[in-house]
């Protein structure tokens, strides 16, 4: 399992893309990325495009935390639906389709 401290720049394969930077004002804590080869310790539902920000529904997770994963192609990872971070499979194609809607 890969533990990533805040504000570091390293390469991690995610859904066919590579992650350039993972930034957070808070320490990473919790679950895992829903892919066999990548484990990132942060709440997956907090990953977001600015227009699609989502929070965990659990009271313990409600805060001003902001997590952002920057991909090498310049896109941020899309927000995943709440409660599906352990089973949701996001393919490179779906990431590209989602990302393209924000490039107008």
UniProtKB/Swiss-Prot annotation:
Compartmental location: Host cytoplasm; Host nucleus
Main location (coarse class): host cell
Motif (Nuclear export signal): 1-35
Keywords: Apoptosis, Host cytoplasm, Host nucleus, Host-virus interaction
Coiled-coil regions listed: none
Superkingdom assignment: Viruses
Location of region: Disordered: 78-104
A GO cellular component entry from the record: host cell cytoplasm
Subunit-structure text: Interacts with host RGS16.
Described function: Plays a role in modulating host cell signaling by binding to and degrading host RGS16. Not necessary for virus replication.
Protein name (Swiss-Prot/TrEMBL): Protein ORF3
